[in-house]
UniProtKB/Swiss-Prot annotation:
Its EC number is 3.1.3.16. Pfam families: Metallophos (PF00149). Belongs to the PPP phosphatase family. PP-6 (PP-V) subfamily. The keyword Cytoplasm does not apply. This is Serine/threonine-protein phosphatase 6 catalytic subunit. It comes from Dictyostelium discoideum (Social amoeba).
Length: 305
């Protein structure tokens, strides 16, 4: 079945910010789930690679990201989740990333973020967008079924860990991430939840998170986790950074944010992080695209998550 799918055609359609016929989207989602089923919770990735943070449905800025970092398959990518919600083109954004994954499975790794959740997408826009564009919720159901298959983390050359949110007090080793049951809705607490929701903070240990999910984690627990697991860098997303990226903990952790002018009003720049074969770090900064297009008249949501 997979060999007969018109993947190049779907990639080209999605690149034009068009969504697929409902039945084609269903087939695409099924194909990507087959691929994701083979991936580990901590998916190994080889350098060189480019690491990306939140996209949040900002389709035209995703095109700018690829213009900045290189097109798939010329560049190998890890996306650290939050593909949908808040932006006007969550459906087209996720469809494009799925089409690229189906066509070039070894050149793009898609991690789960806290917004890859049925509950969150019913509040922050993706559910309503699918309903509006397709006239029913089937597309949302197909896409959210893919969410449950997305992997939780990526490890680059055994040295750089990519995860959407951060660490968990219940996770000391990568092996403990590898045995998490991931094929389900994100739980409200526990290690799976923490990987999606936690944030670094200028503390040493752990504090409850003001988000109401996950934890604030500090420099000491980060250093311990990296030492135990032989890591030299943790890359994560999940927090808006005005400058596009922010280092913490003696440059051993970095937040990468890839949605410029977030929610079309925050005024921030975006970044992607390119690692070469020696894992040398090169941040590429890009700005929101300035172009005339008809913006749908749907209000953006306030920034709570």
């Amino acid at each position: 079945m997979s060999n007969a799918l018109p993947l190049d055609e779907w990639v080209e359609t999605a690149r034009q910010c068009k969504y697929l016929p409902e039945n084609d989207l269903k087939k695409l989602c099924e194909r990507v789930k087959e691929l994701l089923l083979e991936e580990s919770n901590v998916q190994p990735v080889r350098s060189p690679v480019t690491i990306c943070g939140d996209i949040h449905g900002q389709f035209y800025d995703l095109l700018e990201l690829f213009k900045t970092g290189g097109e798939v398959p010329d560049t190998n990518y890890v996306f650290m989740g939050d593909f949908v919600d808040r932006g006007y083109y969550s459906l087209e954004t996720f469809t494009y990333l799925l089409a690229l994954k189906a066509r070039y499975p070894d050149k793009i790794t898609l991690l789960r973020g806290n917004h890859e959740s049925r509950q969150i997408t019913q509040v922050y826009g993706f559910y309503d967008e699918c309903q509006q564009k397709y006239g029913n919720v089937n597309a949302w159901k197909y896409c959210t079924s893919v969410f449950d298959f997305l992997t939780l983390a990526a490890i680059i050359d055994g040295k750089v860990l990519c995860v959407h949110g951060g660490l968990s007090p219940k996770v000391r080793t990568l092996d403990q991430i590898r045995i998490i049951s991931r094929n389900l809705e994100i739980p409200h607490e526990g290690p799976f939840c923490d990987l999606m929701w936690s944030d670094p903070e200028d503390i040493e240990q752990w504090q409850p998170s003001p988000r109401g999910a996950g934890w604030l984690f500090g420099s000491k627990v980060t250093a311990e986790f990296e030492h135990i697991n032989g890591l030299n860098l943790i890359c994560r997303a999940h927090q808006l950074v005005q400058e596009g990226y922010r280092y913490m903990f003696d440059n051993s952790l970095v937040t990468v944010w890839s949605a410029p002018n977030y929610c079309y009003r925050c005024g921030n720049v975006a970044s992607i992080l390119s690692l070469n074969e020696n894992l040398d770090r090169d941040f590429k900064i890009f700005q929101a695209v300035q172009e005339e297009r008809n913006i749908p008249t749907r209000p953006t949501m306030q920034y709570f998550f």
